[in-house]
């Protein structure tokens, strides 16, 4: 049982960090959502829906729009998907990957007195532990503890590096508990044989 848990943690860590790196953005369904990307005015940014390889369909039907803050989705839009921001400026070209995941249940505003932290790229959120299906790039999925945002309109952005560190911390804690369990078992065994 312990071996299976260790194997799960290790596999999940490798599983989600291979391939193209992408930020995982959680948003409450039926609320506004933002794929946060702030660049200079001289920088050109083109948003692409990875499923079609074209600009997102929501831009033409009015359910999303682009601003200097990034790609905004309206409350009428609630579709998961991988979006790519192509960044072009002088002597610099890059692509940011965002996997948008909508949460339909148990996604509500947390109490105001909950501890607050600063997330990736300045996103503010509350910690709320639980299990959720995390989707990585290229439809990779697995379960791991998650965090929920304190305000429905602000998404949580977790990089895959952060997820790897998160899983590594869990792995370390479980390893220490297992080591203590082994020590206690050996101690009881020696006492039983009078050593």
Swiss-Prot record:
Protein name: Early E3 22.2 kDa glycoprotein
Taxonomic superkingdom: Viruses
Manganese as UniProt keyword: no
Keywords: Early protein, Glycoprotein
Sites carrying sugar chains: 20, 61, 76, 88, 126, 139
Disulfide bonds: none
Origin species: Canine adenovirus serotype 1 (strain Glaxo)
Keyword Transport appears in the UniProt entry: no
């Amino acid at each position: 049982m312990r071996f299976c848990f260790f194997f799960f943690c290790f596999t999940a860590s490798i599983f989600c960090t291979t391939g193209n790196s992408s930020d995982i953005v959680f948003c409450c369904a039926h609320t506004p959502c933002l794929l946060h990307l702030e660049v200079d005015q001289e920088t050109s940014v083109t948003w692409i829906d990875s499923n079609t390889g074209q600009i997102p369909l929501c831009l033409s039907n009015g359910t999303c729009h682009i601003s200097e803050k990034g790609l905004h989705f309206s409350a009428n839009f609630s579709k998961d998907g991988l979006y790519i921001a192509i960044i072009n400026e002088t002597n610099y070209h890059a692509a940011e990957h965002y996997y948008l995941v909508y949460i339909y249940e148990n996604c509500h505003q947390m109490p105001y007195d909950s501890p607050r932290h600063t997330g990736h790229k300045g996103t503010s959120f509350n910690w709320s532990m639980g299990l959720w299906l995390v989707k990585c790039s290229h439809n990779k999925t697995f379960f791991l503890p998650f965090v929920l945002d304190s305000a429905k309109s602000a998404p949580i952005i977790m990089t895959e590096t952060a997820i790897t560190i998160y899983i590594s911390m869990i792995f370390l804690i479980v390893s220490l508990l297992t080591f203590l369990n082994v020590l206690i078992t050996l101690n009881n065994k020696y006492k039983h044989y009078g050593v």
